[in-house]
Structures are given as C-alpha cells and as structure tokens.
C-alpha cells in the first residue's frame, strides 16, 4: 500500500460531533466537524449510492476552520435506518432535518457526490428557503442520448461474508475504477461493513435500487430547470459518468451560466483520486457559488 501521508492521519483523527435525527419514522445518522458558530458559513456533504458519511472523513477537515460542516448517511445506507420504499422528497427532508440538527445556518451550501448530487439537487429545489447553494461533484443530468457504462445488477438478499476481513477485501468502487490511493479505498472499506445475522455484509439496503422513486432522468431534468439557488459543478476529467457532452446538455437546461471545473487526473470518485486537489478546487468553487 505504500506510505500513508500525514495529512490523511491528521484528517481522520479530527474530532467530530455525531447525532441522529428522526425523519418519517426512520433514524438518520449524521456527523459534523467544526464549532457551532452563527458567523461561520456551513456545508452539508452528501455521499453517493451505496456509500455513507465516512467517505468525507478525509475531505471535510481540509475545509476547516472556515466552515461548519455536516455529513449524513442517507436512509438505506451507512448506519441510518432502512425503509420499505425510498423517494427523493423524503431524502430531501432528511437533508433539511440534518442541517437543522447539526446547527447549520441558512447560508448552507450542499455538496453532493454522484447520487448525492441528485438528492442535493432535489433538496435545493424542495427546500430552497433553507439552503444557499449547490455544488455537484461528478453529478448532474446526463445527456439522454449518451450511453451509460455497464454496471453490475443489484438487489436480492445481502451477500454474507464469514468474517469482517473477507468482506473488506470484497469491497469495490462502483462504477469500477482504479485508484492509486489504496489507503483511501481501504479506509472506506473498513467503514462499510456491518455484522448481520451469522456473518458480515456491506452497509446498504440491497433492495434500494428497486424501491426508490423520484430520481429518474426526467425528475432530475425538471429539478435542474427549476433550481433557483446558485450552482457550481466539479467533475473528474477522466470520469466515465460525466462528459463534456453532458456538461453541454446541462448548460442547455439552465437560463444562466454556472461555474465548472474539471479535476485533472480524476475519475468518477474524484476525491479519492485527487483528495488534496479536490479540497482546493472545492474551496474555490464554494467562493464562486457564495458570491453568485
């Protein structure tokens, strides 16, 4: 794995506050970094599909002390409860509830990676009075005529592993990609496994993909057209899921231009490929969005 850099240890050892808030009869876990300070701007970080708040453990501290920062486990993922059915409205309500519980101000900017960007977009429309802007991280509204890379089918009974180490070794990024920073993938894997029944499994509802609504392409397109809050976009220059064609399609859906930045040498999981460059690019983007 090679030498793990000091900045990583400093980040993941940064203390954070933890809490749980109930939304529609389900517990939603959240964590927050930095002091509660009414004079300090706030960020709400939203993970991607099948992920969790700990994906941000080595990113959020890099934005201190300038922000109060919170992240959550969307229901159906991480350590939050599972639902029988999932929908964009309820996930958006979870973001608002966490922002309130974590003491984030009305100047909060949502930062959403991948599927988290989709939920962040809907939240920024549904709860425009509670938030101040949105930054999408390799997320957006794909050109419907552009083909998607193949992904493995999901659903059915959870795969059980005999021990935690075996489960961690089976962890894979989705969509599949290489990552030179193996220590980051290993850290995420260690926080992605739970004990269930007579074995270990990954922390997500395997029925999630077949029991959610409000997240179709037409829903995302409608939300992007309706978005009134300032928007910014970061994407991996080498991403399989975000292309210049999709960027052009998104610009065509908006009446006003919005700032974008292609992160060099980064794929879909851009803050795993280039964590330090991502933090700097995000800082710059947040300044642009806050000034819009």
Predicted regions and their residues:
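Conserved alpha/beta-hydrolase catalytic His-Asp/Glu region
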Residues: 162-218
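Catalytic histidine-centered segment of alpha/beta-hydrolase-like enzymes
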Residues: 263-275, 279
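Gly/Ala-rich beta-loop-alpha elbow adjacent to hydrolase catalytic centers
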Residues: 112, 116, 120
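An N-terminal hydrophobic leader/cap segment in hydrolases
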Residues: 1-20, 31
């Amino acid at each position: 794995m090679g030498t793990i850099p000091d900045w990583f240890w400093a980040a993941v050892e940064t203390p954070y506050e933890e809490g749980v808030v109930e939304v529609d009869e389900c517990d939603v876990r959240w964590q927050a970094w930095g002091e509660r300070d009414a004079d300090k701007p706030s960020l709400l970080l939203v993970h991607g599909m099948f992920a969790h708040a700990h994906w941000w453990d080595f990113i959020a501290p890099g934005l201190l002390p300038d922000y109060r920062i919170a992240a959550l486990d969307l229901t159906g993922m991480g350590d939050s409860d599972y639902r029988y059915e999932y929908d964009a409205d309820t996930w958006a309500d979870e973001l608002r509830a966490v922002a309130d519980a974590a003491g984030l101000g009305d100047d909060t900017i949502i930062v959403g990676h991948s599927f988290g960007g989709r939920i962040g977009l809907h939240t920024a429309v549904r709860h425009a009075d509670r938030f101040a802007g949105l930054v999408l991280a390799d997320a957006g509204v794909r050109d419907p005529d552009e083909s998607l890379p193949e992904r493995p089918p999901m659903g059915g009974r959870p795969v059980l592993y005999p021990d935690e180490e075996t489960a961690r070794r089976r962890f894979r990024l989705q969509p599949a990609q290489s990552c030179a920073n193996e220590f980051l993938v290993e850290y995420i894997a260690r926080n992605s496994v739970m004990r269930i029944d007579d074995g270990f499994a990954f922390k997500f509802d395997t029925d999630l993909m077949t029991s959610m609504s409000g997240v179709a392409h037409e829903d995302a397109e409608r939300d992007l057209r309706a978005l009134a809050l300032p928007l910014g976009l970061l994407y991996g220059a080498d991403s399989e899921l975000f292309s210049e064609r999709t960027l052009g399609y998104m610009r065509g859906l908006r009446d006003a231009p919005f700032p974008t930045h292609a992160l060099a040498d980064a794929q879909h999981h851009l803050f795993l490929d280039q964590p330090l460059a991502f933090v700097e690019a995000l800082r710059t983007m947040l300044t642009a969005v806050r000034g819009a």
